[in-house]
């Protein structure tokens, strides 16, 4: 058995690290199979040497996030634990250094996982970036944040957000209300990120000035989109023809981000996904990046991560037991 203590800088920091009713400490105990004792600003672990060392590394990662004013929610603590198991907790400092934008309420936006950081770096470095991954990985929200940052710094003169009109089995014709209401209904998820970043009043003014456009994918046909930050969301529900049409709308001074989840295709049976097609066809082209986020990058409720993993397992074909070779009769 080994024993190791961590002396935190203040009672306030200790309270944040320990969590409400010591919930973070209990999580560390359960995940690393150690015993923890909290006294003032001191946290002492007892257990197997490698488990104690990993628990200390996880606390180091939590301290790093606190220094960057990142709230220690359960999912954040679990991510620290995941990195500590691989000895990568020091890489959390990289997240602190990567500032994206500030919300309308003054909250700074940083990547919450190393996968998200890779995604942001790809967007900065490339003209077209594909962000592929399950729900909850922040791929759309971070793309919107990067678009707002580019707009505010005058790198682009407008923001365009679009998505195909097929999702969860619905088409615009089957939604209630007039066409504008139908558009608003299925494009609403794209509004949320913009309103959070800009505030409702600023967002509305920019829409009226046509500096922000949120429209169905069909509205992109026949246009050349210059000097714009363009985001195609739910791209798994495009056909190959739609994807080609969209990508070839890109004009001078524009940047494109395409987001989607290849496991959630809602197209009619036997219709190929334009996203899957594009990922294959455009692989290796300079200026086009592909970033794959995983369940480790899910930053919603911890159950979302487990749900994603369960569905991924269910999607895998069952393993067949090896068949015994038929016995041959001796001549």
Residue ranges and their predicted role:
Residues 1-16:
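Short glycine-/aliphatic-rich beta-strand segments at the starts of folded cytosolic domains
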Residues 2, 6, 50, 70, ...:
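Intrinsically disordered, low-complexity mixed-charge segments
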Residues 13-30:
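Short amphipathic alpha-helix segments
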Residues 17, 24, 55-58, 243-246:
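Hydrophobic side chains in well-ordered alpha-helices
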Residues 29-37:
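A short, structured beta-strand/loop element
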Residues 37-96:
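Interdomain "pre-motor" coupling segment immediately N-terminal to P-loop NTPase/helicase cores
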Residues 42, 104-116, 122-232, 236-331:
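Conserved helicase motor core of SF1/SF2 NTP-dependent helicases
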Residues 86-114:
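Conserved loop-to-helix interface motifs that mediate assembly, gating, or partner/ligand docking
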